[in-house]
Amino acid sequence: RINLQSRFQWPSFDAYQTYAASFDTYFRSAKSGLGLFVLSDIQGEGFISTSEIKGLYSYQLNMRNDWTVRFGTELGFGQKFYDWDKYVFLDQIDPITGDVSDQSFSEEARPESLQANYFDISSGILFASKSVYAGLSLRHMNRGNDGIILLNENRLSNGVPLMVSMQFGTQIDLNRGNKRNSTAFISPNVLIVKQGDFGQVNAGAYISSSFVFGGAWYRYSWTNADAAVLMVGVQSGIFKLGYSYDFTVSALQAYSSGGAHEIAVSFRFDQSDYFKSRAKKYNSIDCLQLFR
């Protein structure tokens, strides 16, 4: 499977532009999966640019009553660049007019290096049956240091905060009377994320038929409502295309942020007639339909 994604958050502010690509495959005989993930993220018209590349490995342990446990680990390398010349400091602002001159000069000390390189380690576990799943993941376990400000040759940053996420949900078959061609289902699900002092909850449902799919979620942070998310897409054979939009419902909506647009394209080779006819022989992806 190959996935391509792009996300534009708060486009009215030129805030975040994110591009990602990934590949994963499953080796049935080894009960294992391998994957590769690359990401490029641009914040504030290039004030901060982040690039990452990560390798993934997972292992499936079969249990009783059709339950499985999947263990996964992710090892990666990241690079963060700070465009110092785009920053505006207090001593560059005219105290009377508030203007910033192109020729203004700041006495802020320019860091010796504007680039930070770091390693990243993550892991997770997923319990799943044919209709229910629950998972826990830990990201940035080693807290790689992505800061550039030095104090006595040590970076002031304490590293990337540990991210803990929990997810659980169910998959309900909507074609129980026609199990041979059962493709339609609905999946209510919840995602809880905690990183540093920040936390949020996503709750909603994903629905899919043989050709179209969609979903709706509500995202709430620890202190306020954040966004309502709607998604719609089409799928046929190996091809899957989805679009989602985040409707801002926080106080930020007063500033016409533009919400967030996300487009995702997947090429699911395990859904081709060739691989379906040889599912036991070749490397078909073995998971709930929700994750395909």
Locate each region found by the language model.
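Subset of outer-membrane beta-barrel
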Residues: 1-292
